[in-house]
């Protein structure tokens, strides 16, 4: 690298003090009932335990008036016991089992026996009573002396009195049955049918973990098992195949369209050229049947047992998994959130609000899939756009007790309209619509049609609800989709005609405070989510809460529970005096909105790190630099997944955004000085992203905001053929550990190259 080398190692992390706020009081009113009664998650049990005493109880004073110490008293007691020991025989009732002592099998009491006291008498009488009533089983009788082993009788004469007593105890123990682990399991299963013997078992013979019952983290996720014959599946799905060959009674355990995911017993849906190419692999992995839209020769070439030919393979793709997995969305509340921006944040806030109401809520989105709480499921980021993955994930959630699911219906990789029409949505939410043909590869009409498919299913006024942002010009179009008598809840930043709107708000580097007007009262919300765009997500969540009749206190509590969305204007807080934000903005539009939002926070300076990916989208590189240079006080250009392209070539393209070339920049570096841009802002570059991120964080001073863009929550860097771990957030945290040391050393980190005080 031709830039001036750094004279020291740059490490980093960091964070901002978040204002503490008292939790709002809980409203005890339950949420409005839905189609099916919502089972409220159990709250963690709290048991009162009295505090332990500060001091141990005083020890009784030793009584030595008789001239004997405690040790002497103990020695005398032992000696007396040894003297009496020969008088104790195995025939004494004290050493006999209840059956032999009384002959009744239920235990008895001998009034002439000096070894029984009042407690022994009560126990024996109760045992006899319970035995007569059949509440307990009689103790097994000891074998008669005649059945004892002859060798044991011969040994008795040779044993000491102590050994005789031990032998008698051994004989008693021989009458006990040894219970194996398998026997205990059998008894537990039998006892599961009797409600008096314990908690009832669930249908698959396994009880929920305690953590799972309480809705806590770490609960064990149980995988449901499905089984249906091909004939039953075709009948249930109402598909009319063109032809069916092979065994229609073959049992199916799952559905897949990706050959690499096929497991034994699966039905393989052969879609397009990729499906045909993966047919052999699916067969080797154990696919037992194939669905295709063209005739295939499976006899003699494939081991699968059946072939179904259909006219519309996409219809089969969405209907078959829904039927095989028993249409799980019919038994849960499903909230779909669509739009261009703010979709991810809104889904997380809605999930948190439902859980604040006590509803076990799952989420399917690009940042992860959760069954409920923080219990994550293994799923691809595009799972909500995959009809097979979505149905299977929802079936798993339902099997684990999930009552509501929030689905993220973003525009990235959006599927054709209607591909998820087998999901029974209850609420449709629109954030906003921003469309560019170049970014989405779709016309405006196609783009709108795909998003509107969610709202077109809102037809039942008793169950469905529409939630729209009326600040967006497309809001009337979406509100008109589906049934016209379905209630519509509107929200707006400033429009007072909306059902939910802001009355007052305050933005800062560390939190957002907003006063929200609703039809049922005013909400005061303090959130760790930064910027104006996140206020829209908060308003959308409040509108969903109003639509379902959620208690206002639960709405506030749920929203305030979410401190950050990974990689979405995420604040890195290590208690430093300046802000550090990590965001996934990687397009000119997203970068512009992000920096505008950061400027609204009122920072002293904005220091921005921006990079562009290799091997694609060369046209946007100078545009990204131009936006960053115009809206930031300091810009640090760097690489972002350069792949097989030279990072210096990428940076050369980016420098064109400010009218520089790489040759000019290197010439400045040779003179140890980089001049300001025409607007007075500064620009530096470093081809190593780790150095660029850490250097930018080290430039931060009190009141500044350092913005790291491009990766967000992504945790990898692609260089050449290597895909290595890299996390902007961890780099920032590591860097922040050393910022104070650099500043105390007097090093000027405000610009490149860094200088020691004597070099000024």
From Swiss-Prot:
Effect of gene knockout: Pale yellow-green leaf phenotype. Reduced levels of plastid ribosomes and defects in plastid mRNA metabolism.
Xref: InterPro entries: Mur-like_cat_sf, Mur_ligase_C, Mur_ligase_C_dom_sf, Mur_ligase_cen, MurE/MurF_N, UDP-N-AcMur-Glu-dNH2Pim_ligase
Biased composition (Pro residues): 20-34
Record's keyword annotation contains Chloroplast: yes
Entry GO MF terms: acid-amino acid ligase activity; ATP binding
Region feature (Disordered): 13-159, 176-205
Presequence boundaries: 1-59
UniProt keyword Protease present: no
Record keywords: Chloroplast, Plastid, Transcription, Transcription regulation, Transit peptide
Record's function text: Required for the activity of the plastid-encoded RNA polymerase (PEP) and full expression of genes transcribed by PEP. Required for the proper build-up and formation of the PEP-complex.
Family affiliation: Belongs to the MurCDEF family. MurE subfamily.
Subunit: Component of the plastid-encoded plastid RNA polymerase (PEP) complex.
Protein name as annotated: UDP-N-acetylmuramoyl-L-alanyl-D-glutamate--2,6-diaminopimelate ligase MurE homolog, chloroplastic
Source organism of this protein record: Zea mays
């Amino acid at each position: 690298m031709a830039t001036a080398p750094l004279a020291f190692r740059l490490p980093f992390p960091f964070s901002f003090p978040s204002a503490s706020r008292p939790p709002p009081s809980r409203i005890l009113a339950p949420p409005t009932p839905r189609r099916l009664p919502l089972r409220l998650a159990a709250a963690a049990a709290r048991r009162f335990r009295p505090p332990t005493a500060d001091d141990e109880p005083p020890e009784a004073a030793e009584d030595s008036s008789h001239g004997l110490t405690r040790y002497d008293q103990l020695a005398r007691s032992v000696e007396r016991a040894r003297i009496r020991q020969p008088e104790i025989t195995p025939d004494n009732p004290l050493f006999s089992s209840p059956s032999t002592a009384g002959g009744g099998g239920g235990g008895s009491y001998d009034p002439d026996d000096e070894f029984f006291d009042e407690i022994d008498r009560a126990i024996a009488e109760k045992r006899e009573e319970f035995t007569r009533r059949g509440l307990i089983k009689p103790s097994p009788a000891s074998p008669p002396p005649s059945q004892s082993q002859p060798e044991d009788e011969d040994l008795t004469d040779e044993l000491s009195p102590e050994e005789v007593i031990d032998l008698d105890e051994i004989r008693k123990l021989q009458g006990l049955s040894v219970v194996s682990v398998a026997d205990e399991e059998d008894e537990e299963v039998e006892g599961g049918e009797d409600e008096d013997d314990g908690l009832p078992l669930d249908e698959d013979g396994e009880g929920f973990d305690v953590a799972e019952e309480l809705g806590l983290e770490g609960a064990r996720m149980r995988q449901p098992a499905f089984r249906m014959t091909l004939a039953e599946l075709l009948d249930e799905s109402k598909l009319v195949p063109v032809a069916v060959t092979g065994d229609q009674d073959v049992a199916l355990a799952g559905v897949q369209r990706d050959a690499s995911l096929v497991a034994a017993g699966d039905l393989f849906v052969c879609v397009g050229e990729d499906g045909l190419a993966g047919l052999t692999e699916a067969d080797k992995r154990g696919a037992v049947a194939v669905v295709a839209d063209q005739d295939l020769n499976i006899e003699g070439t494939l081991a699968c047992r059946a072939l179904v030919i259909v006219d519309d393979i996409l219809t089969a793709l969405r209907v078959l998994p829904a039927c095989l997995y028993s249409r799980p969305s019919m038994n849960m509340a499903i909230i779909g959130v669509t739009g261009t921006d703010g979709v991810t944040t809104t889904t997380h806030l809605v999930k948190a609000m439902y859980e604040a109401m006590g509803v076990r809520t799952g989420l399917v989105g690009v940042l992860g899939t959760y069954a409920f709480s923080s219990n994550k499921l293994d799923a691809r980021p595009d799972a909500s756009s995959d009809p097979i993955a979505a149905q299977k994930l929802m079936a798993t959630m339902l099997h684990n007790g999930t009552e509501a699911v929030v689905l993220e219906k973003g525009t990235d990789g959006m599927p054709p309209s209607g591909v998820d029409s087998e999901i029974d949505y209850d609420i449709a939410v629109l954030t906003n619509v921003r469309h560019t043909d170049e970014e989405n590869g779709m016309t405006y009409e196609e783009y709108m049609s795909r998003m509107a498919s969610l709202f077109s299913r809102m037809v039942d006024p008793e169950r469905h609800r529409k939630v729209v942002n009326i600040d967006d010009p497309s809001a009337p179009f979406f509100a008109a989709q589906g049934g016209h008598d379905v209630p519509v809840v509107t929200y707006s930043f400033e429009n007072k005609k909306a059902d939910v709107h802001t009355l007052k708000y305050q933005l800062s580097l560390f939190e957002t405070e907003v006063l929200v007007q609703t039809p049922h009262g005013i909400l005061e919300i303090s959130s760790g989510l930064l910027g104006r765009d996140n206020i829209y997500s908060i308003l959308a969540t409040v509108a969903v809460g109003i639509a379902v009749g959620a208690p206002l206190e639960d709405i506030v509590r749920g929203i305030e529970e979410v401190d950050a969305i990974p990689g979405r204007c995420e604040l890195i807080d290590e208690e430093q005096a300046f802000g550090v934000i990590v965001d996934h903005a990687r397009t000119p539009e997203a970068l512009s909105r992000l920096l505008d939002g950061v400027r609204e926070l009122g920072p002293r300076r904005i220091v921005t790190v921006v990079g562009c990916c290799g091997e694609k989208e060369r046209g946007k590189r100078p545009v990204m630099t131009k936006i960053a240079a115009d809206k930031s006080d300091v810009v640090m250009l760097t690489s972002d997944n350069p792949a097989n392209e030279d990072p210096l070539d990428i940076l050369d393209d980016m420098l064109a955004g400010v009218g520089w070339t790489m040759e000019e920049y290197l010439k400045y570096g040779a003179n140890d000085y980089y001049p300001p841009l025409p607007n007075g802002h500064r620009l530096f570059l470093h081809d190593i992203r780790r150095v660029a991120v850490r250097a930018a964080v080290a430039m931060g001073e009190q009141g500044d905001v350092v913005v790291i863009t491009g990766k967000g929550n992504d945790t990898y860097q692609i260089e050449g053929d290597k895909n290595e771990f890299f996390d902007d957030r961890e780099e920032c945290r590591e860097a922040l550990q050393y910022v104070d040391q650099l500043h105390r050393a007097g090093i000027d980190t405000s610009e490149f190259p860094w200088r020691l005080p004597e070099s000024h």
